[in-house]
Amino acid sequence: MIKITKTISQSTQSGGRKTAKARVQLLPGTGTKVMVNGKQASDYFQNNAVYLQNMFTPRDLVKTETKYDVHILVEGGGLSAQAQAVKLALSKAFVDFFPEYRKVFKKPGLLTRDARIKERRKYGLKKARKAPQFSKR
């Protein structure tokens, strides 16, 4: 039996967090080109170290900082949710390239989407759970 291994030159994956959606395209390259919506990642995320570190957790985990260029399209949500959506999409893209990384990413939970979203407002209440003041008399 012949075992066929697929070789891919690029990987495109998507990720989400709250209302933020991210599409990541991972290409072999120098690693210096990380574009988010046409801007450098540091400019887009306003040089915020927390967002950038969170976003590049998968890349740092497998030590591939200088091997791949990343093109990212994000929409919706805030910067923090967008960074977390990129983290999920980047993890999925690396697993698409290298299936052996699946265990490495699964253990810290990088392949799991955070399902927490804003709870809807209910009628009779002021917010999702905040009730109007109660008066006995």
Curated annotation (Swiss-Prot):
GO terms for cellular component: chloroplast; small ribosomal subunit. Keywords: Chloroplast, Plastid, Ribonucleoprotein, Ribosomal protein. GO terms for molecular function: RNA binding; structural constituent of ribosome. Signal peptide: none annotated. PROSITE patterns: RIBOSOMAL_S9 (PS00360). NCBIfam families: PRK00132.1. The gene is rps9. PANTHER family: RIBOSOMAL PROTEIN S9, SMALL RIBOSOMAL SUBUNIT PROTEIN US9M. It is found in: Plastid, Chloroplast. Belongs to the universal ribosomal protein uS9 family. One of its GO terms (biological process) is translation. It comes from the Eukaryota. This is Small ribosomal subunit protein uS9c. It comes from Chlorella vulgaris.
